[in-house]
Amino acid sequence: MVEGIVFEHVSKKFADSIALNDVSFAINKGEFFSLLGPSGCGKTTLLRILAGFEKPDQGRILLDGQDITKLPANKRPINTVFQNYALFPHLTIWENIAFGLRIAQRSETEIKREVEQMLGLIQMKEHGHKKPDQISGGQKQRVAIARALVNHPRILLLDEPLAALDLKLRQKMLLDLDRIHDEVGITFIFVTHDQSEAMAVSDRIAVLHKGSLEQIGNPIEIYEMPKSSFVADFIGDTNFFDGWVKETAQKEYSLVDVEGFPQIYCFNDKQLSKGDAVHLSVRPEKIHISREQIQAHPLQNVFQGIVDDVIYKGDHTHFGIQVGDRKISVNQQHSRFLLDEAPIKWKDVVWIWWHSDDGFILERCQKLENNNE
């Protein structure tokens, strides 16, 4: 028996709109798993199908080997935390957490034990007597999580639970969610459109786009080894190049002719031939910048350019560097700051460089007219 959740060929339409298109993947038991994508990608629909609030048009859902596709929502060992908290304003925090236990007709001794345990888990033992309007937004979210966990579900669904919180509070709640997950050990499924949230807490991430699964992997795989242009662009910033394979070097690397730009060496894990049209990506933080000319090493990309944009962002400075017909984004991290160090300025002539391992071929493009042969 496979432990965890399995989606098998799940499809869903609303009128003429395709919400999910033949989606298949598995979530391991006990994982902190994120469904990530822009609005309308299908992530919330997938969550609602798992919760039992929607039925798929095709496909099925397995939980620990059992088909739960037709099981009513109230029969599934799954609880959901929503963005709006949905706390009862007339009940205390203690009573809000106890509500589900009372519905289940648990004994008062058991209710007291479970509620006190949950208050300890969310670090709010001293707030049990308060009403929801007497606590902060972050505390309300923790109470909503405790209320969802008190009945010991096998799966907790989190539907954009941090969207209403400010930045600092979201960062604090992410740490709380990670800690709570580690302590309770059940499967958490986290829906978000915020890449940084998913990257911070997830064991694995499923990236969805227009109802289809683009990629699934751990945060490092998703960021460093995107499988498509959409994933590379949605997860952080990147520079894209279209070109043709001119030659292969040492099997793992290709030299690519790029229109309006010098040739680029890049990592290649695909079966490509000379003349193939390809799509390349290199992250701005992988590119180095200097006023001094750099001696190019084998398989290193070194180019001269002119600074067109300079934007100071605190922990790093963003540069737009004009090289040939292209403007290249470069992010220089600030490992130290010296008052007497002359900063790179607008219209400065600079050198930028990156190793071929830091640029990668995402996919083949449709055949372009190649005048380089």
From Swiss-Prot:
It catalyses: ATP + H2O + polyamine-[polyamine-binding protein]Side 1 = ADP + phosphate + polyamineSide 2 + [polyamine-binding protein]Side 1. CDD domains: ABC_PotA_N. It is a peripheral membrane protein. GO terms for molecular function: ABC-type putrescine transporter activity; ATP binding; ATP hydrolysis activity. Signal peptide: none annotated. Its main location: membrane. Keywords: ATP-binding, Cell inner membrane, Cell membrane, Membrane, Nucleotide-binding, Translocase, Transport. The keyword Amino-acid biosynthesis does not apply. InterPro entries: AAA+_ATPase, ABC_SmlMolc_Importer, ABC_transporter-like_ATP-bd, ABC_transporter-like_CS, Mo/tungstate-bd_C_term_dom, P-loop_NTPase, PotA-like, PotA_ATP-bd. Its EC number is 7.6.2.11. Pfam families: ABC_tran, TOBE_2. Residues 5-235 form the ABC transporter domain. Belongs to the ABC transporter superfamily. Spermidine/putrescine importer (TC 3.A.1.11.1) family. NCBIfam families: potA. The complex is composed of two ATP-binding proteins (PotA), two transmembrane proteins (PotB and PotC) and a solute-binding protein (PotD). This is Spermidine/putrescine import ATP-binding protein PotA. The lineage of its organism: Bacteria, Pseudomonadati, Chlamydiota, Chlamydiia, Parachlamydiales. The gene is potA.
